[in-house]
C-alpha cells in the first residue's frame, strides 16, 4: 500500500486552484480516484484528505456502532456531511471548497502534510507552530 509521505507547500493561484503534490496524486490514483476526498479535521485547524478506500474504512467503523446510535449519527454528520470529493484538473490542481479553506484558516498557500494513510492541509504558518510544539514535546520526553 502506498502512503502519503513528506510535507509540501504550494501556492493558491488567482483562480483559487492549488497543485496537489505529484506523490500524493499518485497514491490517490492508485486507489482509483482522480481526485481526493476532503473534510474539516474534527480536532485540528486543518483539512483532512484521503482516498475513497479510507472513507470506506471510516464508514465501516461508524456502522459498527449500530444503525441508530447517537455516536454513529454524530460522527457521520461530522465527517460525511462535510466531506467533498474534489477532482484534479489536467495539471493536477484542485479548487478546495471555500468552507474548508475558512475552517483551516488557509489564505494563499497550503501545506500538504503526509500522515501515512491520510494527509492534512494546513495554513503553513499554523502548521509550523503546531509542528514546533510537537517537536518541543518530543524533546522533553527524551530527556
What name fits each language-model region?
Residues 2-42:
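A positional/architectural concept
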Residues 7, 30-45, 102-127:
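A short beta-strand-loop micro-motif that forms or neighbors metal/cofactor-
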Residues 16-20, 92-96, 100, 121:
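Short, structured motif recognition centered on aromatic/hydrophobic residues
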Residues 26-29, 33-63, 70-77:
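Active-site rim/adjacent substrate-binding subdomains
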Residues 57, 63-94, 100:
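Short, solvent-exposed interaction modules
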Residues 129-131:
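Acidic, proline/serine/threonine- and glycine-rich low-complexity intrinsically disordered segments
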Residues 133-140:
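Conserved small/polar residues in nucleotide/adenosyl-binding loops
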